[in-house]
Amino acid sequence: MRYAVITRHRREFEVRLMCRVLAVSPAGYYASLTRPASWHAVVDDLLMRHVRIAHAASGETYGAPRVQQELTAAGLPVSTKRVARLMREDGLAARGKKARRVATTDSHHAEPIAPNLLARQFDVHGSAVNRVWVSDITAIPTREGLLYLATVLDLGSRRCVGWAMRDRIDLDLALSALRMARQARHPAPGLIHHSDRGSVYAALGYRAELAAHGMVASMSRKGDCYDNAVAESFFATLEFELLRKHDWPTRAEARRAIFRYIETWYNPRRRHSTLGYVSPAEYEVQLEAAA
């Protein structure tokens, strides 16, 4: 196995150096090149090619569990342990998460606060969609200034069903994301809409929009980000997989990148651990087929 590692990296590093690091003799390594490759090594080489492709396609964000799911979906059944070994040998790893949230919640207002109907009961997937939506707003830095992103996620499938971006936080930003979700999904009356206590979500105009379409407001407890953990998790994933890699000169460039991330990666393709490592779109197809 150590010989295979040397062969994979011989164009990058000196063979003698790698032999010393891996505690094998150069003579033994060169002798191994004249022997027929074992079946195990041949399969490893094939799998490694697919591991590299899956890892690169994710923007180098997938770790072994998600890469393993990609290979299995491609008809290459392999254990997570083997994928982890191959990734380790090739120097591939999911880049660690690092939070960079800018505070966007203004909870110092006199507007009414809705009760917390969700109470951290986030595990509603597997039953249906359009029963609980969670909303939040985050700030995205660009060299031109902050860009604000409002999102609406379906708790049943973790799909981002509505989103909007503006240069500032206001009622129109939050309403635009909500209206996009409503027009795309047409939920039945009784849907629970959960958010933090921010002034835009507590505003009369937002409450009126919810009431007009039969949605029931729910809000987190004061100062408790875990009460809206699903929305926070989405923003952490966005930060990890997209935002930290870029220094956008303008808001327009950031808008285009975030649009692509949500609509061409996160919703249709990104494997979600909560959903059994399928994408939100695929999970909804499974729910519909099982109904």
Go through each PLM region and give its residues.
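Charged DNA-binding/catalytic regions of mobile-element recombinases
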Residues: 1-291
